Swiss-Prot record:
Allosterically activated by HslU binding. The gene is hslV. This is ATP-dependent protease subunit HslV. Pfam families: Proteasome. Protease subunit of a proteasome-like degradation complex believed to be a general protein degrading machinery. Its main location: cytoplasm. It comes from the Bacteria. It comes from Burkholderia cenocepacia (strain ATCC BAA-245 / DSM 16553 / LMG 16656 / NCTC 13227 / J2315 / CF5610). PROSITE patterns: PROTEASOME_BETA_2. The active site is at T7. Gene3D superfamilies: Glutamine Phosphoribosylpyrophosphate, subunit 1, domain 1 (3.60.20.10). InterPro entries: ATP-dep_Prtase_HsIV_su (IPR022281), Ntn_hydrolases_N (IPR029055), Proteasome_sua/b (IPR001353), Proteasome_suB-type (IPR023333). The lineage of its organism: Bacteria, Pseudomonadati, Pseudomonadota, Betaproteobacteria, Burkholderiales. Na(+) binds at G162, C165, T168. Transmembrane segments: none annotated. SUPFAM superfamilies: N-terminal nucleophile aminohydrolases (Ntn hydrolases) (SSF56235).
């Protein structure tokens, strides 16, 4: 059976502000199943942003586990991400999950990959999902050549990804921490 997939999640950090946004499209094979899915959320007393891409059920499973780690480590984003990655590498069930997360708080942005790696993005810009490369390239160009806010950059980057990637639409949800 085919999995639900396809999305774009992008994060931009500039100064003391961070924005994380995603589109709303969910596809099953070549069929759009939903156009308004919410793949970006606030967790841990609204102090942490998280966006997910990949198989929907897998992403929700990882999100639940990440939230539990965040609670256990009292909101320490890096510690929670590393502990989740350790579990991901050692737990047979988790190793089969096909999803990625971008997490951000007031000071740190991290990508948690499908291999159980934790990456600190270079330049405060990261993107995942089917339109991630388009969004990341657009965000990098905008960061280097404009004075736009992180929210504006995320919005424009998602728009460009939505124009180019058939698995990404223009229904955007963007969250910020300032």
């Amino acid at each position: 059976m085919e999995q639900f997939h396809g999305t774009t999640i992008v994060s931009v950090r500039r100064g003391d502000k961070v924005a994380l946004g995603g589109d709303g499209q969910v596809t099953l094979g070549n069929i759009v199943m939903k156009g308004g899915a919410r793949k970006v959320r606030r967790i841990y007393n609204n102090q942490v942003l998280v966006g997910f891409a990949g198989g929907t059920a897998d992403a929700f499973s990882l999100l639940d586990r990440f939230e539990a780690k965040l609670e256990k480590h009292q909101g320490n984003l890096t510690r929670a991400a590393v502990e989740l990655a350790k579990d991901w590498r050692t737990d047979r069930m988790l190793r089969r999950l096909e999803a990625m997360l971008i997490t951000a708080d007031a000071t740190t942005t991290l990508v948690i990959t499908g291999n159980g790696d934790v990456l600190d993005p270079e330049g405060g810009i990261c993107a995942i999902g089917s339109g991630g490369a388009y969004a990341q390239a657009a965000a990098r160009a905008l960061v280097e050549n404009t004075d736009l806010s992180p929210r504006e950059i995320v919005e424009k980057s998602l728009g460009i990804a939505g124009d180019m990637c058939i698995y990404t639409n223009h229904n955007r949800i963007i969250e910020t921490i300032e």
